[in-house]
């Protein structure tokens, strides 16, 4: 127990120590100030902007910014789709893996351009090295950079006033990749290689075991993909077992680096925001609320797994319980990680839009599985994905400002800018579109017989598997309850739709809100005298409960039919 507490404290301290320097660095990068990586990144940026021409030089309005973002994503989608369909005839395919079917290729392409990395295929048998490196790994970089661009555009809109532009998407995209994601990923990949993660393009090895049987040992460019998988909060594993596989996550050190990587940029953006708007206290308040939500989620999930079998009344289990005095749920977990390393990793990955796992979520107790769902359903605002976590949290922040101001009889304003009805429309659109998508698609899937045939469990747990799939897809997480066999035409297409709606529906609302905020006048005197204090402890509590009430209660009826009912069923075994 003491070692678990030390690990947790070390993790939190590491994230806190990273936040300010990395946040300041991100601020300098996007504010066109000198950085210590200019010598490395500028040559790449010059070539990139030279190819783009004039489109990368002019500042863009919100509509133009969104149009550029969607145009880029469409091109990326077509690029990935074609490679996946044709991978059987492309080079670097020593295992002679065939091209995907169209529904599966469509699902996978959508998954990677939306930073979801939902996988209805097994990585070691479904994708060639060429497709892994040129299609999927590239999207791990640029899809994360797209989310970062949206967050930066939103931050600019708060900091600027009485103007019409929020930056240039193409310029921001290059900065996100060349100054931030690529350099850090190179360092992480080198560390992974030294820790034993393979990085090659060899054919799979066929070895004879001591038992006289043949075993196939997969190979591949794993370290490079694993680095950006976590840093870019992508989560798509090179192997079907994801970070439970010893080639993806061989040591406690790689496990720790992956967890820190997932939260690093998301945490840093809170300081970037505070520094950019001239109020670092505001940034630290956001960090604090995120941290409290994370701790609560981790505690509930860990206790559920450490004591997940204590309530079972089976005689056989009671006999074991009587012998050991305590029975934790180790099903689906790596013995080298144990319960706490597993719950910590999976709380991190479901709080962010990462989706990587080092244990099987479908084997978790219903209450622990519910916490994973809730982390995603509230919009993954507990630090969250690269960029996506910040702009998702900002929507709740705006709602809390609006509610709090009206409660005390003041005109809603945030950092000197009036919050008007149109702003709240975009805010609520961003907050509700993913949840509506989840409820509609889950309801449809629950009454379709062909979907029932893909389940390995029935009843409440079977419903939980369906619900988890659409929560994960719509919130661009990508993790799954493994009991759902997702490679069917219906699930491939509907989960792809949920990923598209959850990604670009929210981004559209966020950018439109940014376009509204950037045009407003900014009066700091008005903010100080007649508005809600948005850096106070009381406001932090208001934001906390706004997230729980709006995000949590909306999905609560569905959770009641799934994991809550599943937990109650277990209690009466």
UniProtKB/Swiss-Prot annotation:
Which Cys-Cys disulfides exist here?
none
GO cellular component annotations, sorted alphabetically?
plasma membrane
Instruction: Cite the entry's keywords alphabetically.
Output: Cell inner membrane, Cell membrane, Ion transport, Membrane, Potassium, Potassium transport, Transmembrane, Transmembrane helix, Transport
**From the UniProt record, which GO molecular function terms apply?**
P-type potassium transmembrane transporter activity; potassium ion binding
**What's the chief localization of this chain?**
membrane
Q: How does this chain sit within the bilayer?
A: Multi-pass membrane protein
> Which regions span the lipid bilayer?
6-26, 66-86, 135-155, 177-197, 257-277, 283-303, 382-402, 428-448, 493-513, 537-557
What's the short name of a Pfam family annotated to this entry? Answer: KdpA
Location of the protein in the cell: Cell inner membrane
- Family named by the database record: Belongs to the KdpA family.
Q: Share what the entry says about its subunit structure, partners included.
A: The system is composed of three essential subunits: KdpA, KdpB and KdpC.
Q: What does this protein do?
A: Part of the high-affinity ATP-driven potassium transport (or Kdp) system, which catalyzes the hydrolysis of ATP coupled with the electrogenic transport of potassium into the cytoplasm. This subunit binds the periplasmic potassium ions and delivers the ions to the membrane domain of KdpB through an intramembrane tunnel.
Q: What PANTHER family is this protein classified in?
A: POTASSIUM-TRANSPORTING ATPASE A CHAIN, POTASSIUM-TRANSPORTING ATPASE POTASSIUM-BINDING SUBUNIT
The protein, known as: Potassium-transporting ATPase potassium-binding subunit
**Source species of the chain:** Francisella tularensis subsp. tularensis (strain WY96-3418)
